[in-house]
Each structure stands twice: as C-alpha cells, then as structure tokens.
C-alpha cells in the first residue's frame, strides 16, 4: 500500500493483504504522453472482495481500469492479475463499460450481444461452439435475460441494457470484474437487483472493482472503499466512513491522518476517528467551518451528525 494512504480498517483486515491476491498493483505510474495520471499507485484486491473506487473526474479511475485491462502500458510499476501480467490474464477479466460506450443501434439480439463478450476467447470471424453458448446462456440466466434473449438490443430499456453489459462480462467467467459507473441511468429496483447479484458473485469468489461517482450506492453496495487522487489515498471498510466524510474527501477535503506513512509490508496501522472539512451551512465549501468555530477548524464526524 502506498505511503500516504488513509486507512480506517484494522491492520488485521484480510482486505489489506493476501498471499494469492486476484489483483496486485505495485508502484504504478501511468498516463498519456508526458502527463502522469497515476503516480506510485499500489493496490491489492483479494478473491471475493467487492470494492468501490471513488474519485473526482480526472483523478485516475478510468486510467486505472484501462491499465488493469492491458489497454494502457504503464510507464513503470507492475500489474498482476492472478499472478500473470494484465495482458496475459485479460481472458479472466470481465469489463462492464458505461452504457453509452456500447453500440445499441447495431442489429443484433440480446444473446448475440452477450456472445460478443467471448470474442477474445473464440477469435475474430470464428463461429461460437456449443461450450460458448452454454456460458452465454448461463450468463443470461444469472442476469434474468433469458426471456429477452431474442429481442433486438435497440428495443431494451436502460436497466435491461445494463444487465446485457453485465451478462456480456459474465460470459467469460471472470475472476476479476471491473464495473464502470454501473448504476448510471438505472431505476431503483434494477440497482437493487444488480447489487444483490454483485454480492452473490463476490460470495462465489469473484473480485469486483466498481468505479463510481455515486457515494451512497458505493457505501451501501461495497464492503471496501478505495479513493484515488493520482495515488491510492483512501482505503478502508465501507462501514467505517460516513457519507459526509466521503463527500468531503471526493471534493478535496482531507481526512485527518492523510499523508501519514503506513506500516511495514503495506499494512497500515489503525488511525483515529477521522476529522474532515465539509461545506458550511451557508453552502460555502471552501472554509469547512461552522458557526461558533474558528476558521480552519476541522469538523469531526460527531459534529457532522449533530
């Protein structure tokens, strides 16, 4: 774990280390051209973890997902998926993009769209085998899409489209599942159903990393939350954060203790109850003060809840 990471979980939390992690990122530097987006980024994810990835626009969430999938070569550092390089292990990585990134006007059915998730395994311009269709139908069943398998994808609702993208990722039987804003544009019942399915997958040993701007959904869905500001600068159990703390962190205020060194071997020691700056009652987000407190006072979680 990188120096400067704020950790709210116990140092004995299994999320902080494993002998056989699904994903291991060490001292990663990555970006575009001469612009470094990720700097000395380290993260370990273990089998069965459901982790929310938080950060403002431009913080590095998309860059991280691209690097994990082997679509972006890092300047330095390492990414290992199941002990192999990201490119070698891509067949075991399922990716759920944002809905607008998929071509929904393409004239194919739901089952054919899900089969496109197996293109890398099958090969371009090759016909799927029976074993491929078995995996596709299993993914359709997991996502409750079997009744819609022959429907053109252009006729689907937003929630149905999100389930198609998930089924497409599940068709590769992933060990690591990457989700990019999976709750955008879906209604509450669909979000609840998807969350339950993600939890089931995690319970079966699938490691899930969900990039999202939805702080409430991340805290309600995930067991662990990580935050990126170029490097990994927030990490802990979801239950150890309040929504106010996460909102403040995403919008630029620091948790007390941020910047302190972590312990040896990447296991951080326990930290005190975090103190944060939050928007004042008058809507000013710069001061983080309340009436009766001097300028620069950092509001505690207890004061936030008051």
What are these regions (language model features)?
Residues 69:
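Helix-to-loop junction immediately C-terminal to a conserved catalytic motif
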Residues 77-89:
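Conserved ABC transporter NBD signature motif
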Residues 130-148:
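Conserved ABC ATPase "signature" region
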Residues 152-156, 160:
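Conserved ABC ATPase signature
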Residues 177-180:
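Catalytic Walker B motif of ABC-type/P-loop ATPase nucleotide-binding domains
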Residues 212-213:
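H-loop/switch region of ABC-family ATPase nucleotide-binding domains
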Residues 225-238:
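H-loop (His-switch) and adjacent beta-strand-loop-beta switch element
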């Amino acid at each position: 774990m990188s120096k400067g990471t704020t950790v709210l979980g116990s140092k004995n939390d299994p999320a902080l280390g494993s002998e056989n992690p699904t994903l291991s990122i060490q001292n990663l530097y990555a970006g575009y051209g001469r612009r470094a987006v990720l700097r000395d980024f380290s993260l370990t994810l273990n089998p069965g973890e459901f982790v929310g990835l938080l950060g403002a626009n431009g913080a590095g969430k998309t860059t991280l997902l691209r690097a994990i999938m082997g679509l972006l070569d890092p300047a330095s550092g390492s990414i290992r998926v199941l002990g192999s390089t990201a490119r070698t292990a891509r067949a075991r990585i399922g990716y759920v993009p944002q809905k607008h990134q998929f071509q929904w006007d393409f004239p194919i059915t739901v089952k054919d769209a899900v089969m496109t998730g197996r293109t890398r395994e099958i090969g371009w311009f090759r016909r799927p085998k029976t074993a491929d269709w078995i995996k596709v139908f299993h993914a359709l069943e997991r996502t409750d899409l079997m009744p819609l398998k022959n429907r053109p994808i252009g006729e689907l609702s937003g929630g149905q489209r999100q389930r198609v993208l998930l089924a497409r990722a599940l068709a590769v039987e992933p060990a690591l599942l990457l989700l990019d804003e999976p709750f955008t544009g879906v209604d509450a019942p669909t979000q609840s159903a998807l969350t339950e399915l993600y939890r089931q997958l995690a319970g079966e040993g699938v490691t899930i990393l969900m990039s999202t701007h939805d702080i409430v959904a991340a805290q309600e869905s995930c067991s662990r939350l990580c935050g990126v500001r170029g490097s990994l600068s927030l990490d802990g159990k979801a239950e150890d954060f309040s929504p106010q703390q996460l909102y403040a962190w995403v919008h630029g205020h620091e948790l007390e203790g941020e910047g302190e060194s972590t312990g040896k071997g990447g296991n951080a020691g326990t930290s005190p109850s975090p103190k944060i700056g939050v928007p004042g009652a008058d809507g000013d987000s710069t001061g983080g003060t309340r009436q009766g407190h001097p300028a620069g006072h950092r509001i505690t979680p207890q004061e936030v809840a008051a």
